[in-house]
């Protein structure tokens, strides 16, 4: 039985990179999410910027509450990145084998990334919904994962799934841009690499830079849908006193109309700067860590090949 070591290495390195970057940037993610979700309240604006969210936590002596839902977010992040990178690597390898091409084009890459993203969204949507509800609850009043998911019916755990599927275009755009830039950056190094040695890898700074550029482009193009998804998922976790109001906010059209009515067209981009700051740093860190882990994985595969006598055809170049 052939083990798809290439897909496994990609999935593992991507998941570990996501876990580390999510933990480092989680307080920023909490502030961003609470700021974006404020559209669910009518009337006065509570937060003018991210600093107001941070100051609220400090003034209420709830700084540690900036980490509420971290365990759920890490679990969701690890699983989603593992599924995504495994699916992306597997579909990409399958495409190259079936088509006979030596490289993958931009259009095919976009489709493959979207397919991997769709699988990821379906598999991790309940965890994504739970983490959003936990983050947007009042500081110090966040509930556990099971209690959060069991408050409503099972369908509530999949709030925002349709938008999550739409947002598969975000990582699709991101990784398409990143891969194309990466291929160009490594072209000369790969041509000069000796056979049997580890393929050239990006430097930490270059991986960070390319990750930031690719994620910025993807975020700007998909942000209205991102904010709409946050509002839909956060509706159940705050004001539970009015079920009718919450119910009316669970459709995409009602949320889009509500933003337009209260904030105008610029409301669709409220918090864009915060989203870019968080996602660019997160994705850049993820890809930077992934590149380093992938390079180390190659060394491990060579060791397995030599000492465990794995057949040559079963070990794929990473």
From Swiss-Prot:
Q: Which InterPro entries match?
A: Mit_carrier, Mitochondrial_sb/sol_carrier, Mt_carrier_dom_sf, Peroxisomal_Ade_carrier
Its source organism is: Glycine max
Tell me what turns on expression of this protein.
Down-regulated upon illumination in seedlings germinated in the dark.
Which residues form the Solcar repeats?
A: 5-94, 104-184, 202-296
Show the GO cellular component annotation of the record: peroxisomal membrane; peroxisome
Top-level taxon: Eukaryota
PANTHER family the record matches: PEROXISOMAL ADENINE NUCLEOTIDE CARRIER 1, PEROXISOMAL ADENINE NUCLEOTIDE TRANSPORTER 1
Q: Does the keyword Transmembrane apply?
A: yes
Gene3D superfamilies recorded for this chain?
Mitochondrial carrier domain
Per the record, the major location class is: membrane
Which GO molecular function terms does the record list?
ADP transmembrane transporter activity; antiporter activity; ATP transmembrane transporter activity
Q: Keywords in UniProt for this one?
A: Antiport, Membrane, Peroxisome, Repeat, Transmembrane, Transmembrane helix, Transport
Q: Which PROSITE patterns match?
A: SOLCAR (PS50920)
**Primary role:** Peroxisomal adenine nucleotide transporter catalyzing the counterexchange of ATP with AMP. ATP is needed by reactions that generate acyl-CoA for peroxisomal fatty acid beta-oxidation during postgerminative growth. Required for the conversion of seed-reserved triacylglycerols into sucrose that is necessary for growth before the onset of photosynthesis.
What is one process in the GO biological process aspect for this record? fatty acid beta-oxidation
How this chain sits in the membrane, per its record, is: Multi-pass membrane protein
Asked if the keyword Oxidoreductase belongs to this entry, the reply reads no
Q: Where in the cell is it found?
A: Peroxisome membrane
Tell me which family the UniProt entry assigns to this protein. Answer: Belongs to the mitochondrial carrier (TC 2.A.29) family.
Coiled-coil-forming residues are none
Classification from the root reads: Eukaryota, Viridiplantae, Streptophyta, Embryophyta, Tracheophyta
Q: What is this protein called?
A: Peroxisomal adenine nucleotide carrier 1
């Amino acid at each position: 039985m052939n083990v798809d070591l290439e897909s496994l290495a990609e999935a593992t390195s991507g998941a570990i990179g996501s876990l580390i970057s999510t933990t480092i940037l989680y307080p920023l993610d909490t502030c961003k999410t609470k700021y974006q979700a404020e559209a669910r309240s009518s009337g006065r604006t509570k937060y003018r910027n991210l600093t107001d969210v941070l100051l609220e936590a400090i003034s209420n002596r709830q700084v540690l509450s900036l980490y509420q839902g971290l365990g759920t977010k890490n679990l969701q992040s690890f699983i989603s990145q593992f599924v995504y990178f495994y699916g992306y690597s597997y579909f990409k390898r399958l495409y190259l084998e079936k088509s006979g091409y030596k490289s993958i084009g931009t259009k095919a890459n976009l489709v493959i990334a979207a397919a991997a993203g769709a699988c990821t969204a379906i598999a991790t949507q309940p965890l994504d919904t739970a983490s959003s509800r936990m983050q947007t609850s009042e500081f110090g009043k966040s509930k556990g994962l099971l209690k959060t998911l069991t408050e409503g019916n099972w369908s509530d755990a999949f709030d925002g799934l349709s938008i999550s599927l739409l947002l598969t275009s975000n990582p699709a755009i991101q990784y398409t841009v990143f891969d194309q830039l990466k291929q160009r950056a490594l072209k000369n190094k790969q041509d000069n690499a000796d056979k049997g040695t580890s393929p050239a890898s990006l430097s930490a700074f270059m991986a960070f830079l390319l990750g930031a550029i690719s994620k910025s482009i993807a975020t700007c193009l998909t942000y209205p849908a991102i904010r709409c998804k946050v509002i839909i998922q956060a509706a159940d976790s705050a004001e539970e006193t009015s079920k009718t109001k919450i119910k009316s906010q669970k459709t995409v059209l009602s949320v889009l109309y509500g933003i337009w009515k209260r904030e105008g067209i610029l409301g669709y981009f409220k918090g864009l700067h915060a989203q870019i700051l968080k996602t660019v740093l997160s994705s850049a860190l993820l890809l930077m860590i992934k590149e380093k882990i992938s390079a180390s994985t190659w060394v491990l595969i060579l060791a397995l090949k030599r000492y465990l006598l794995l057949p040559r055809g079963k070990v794929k170049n990473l």
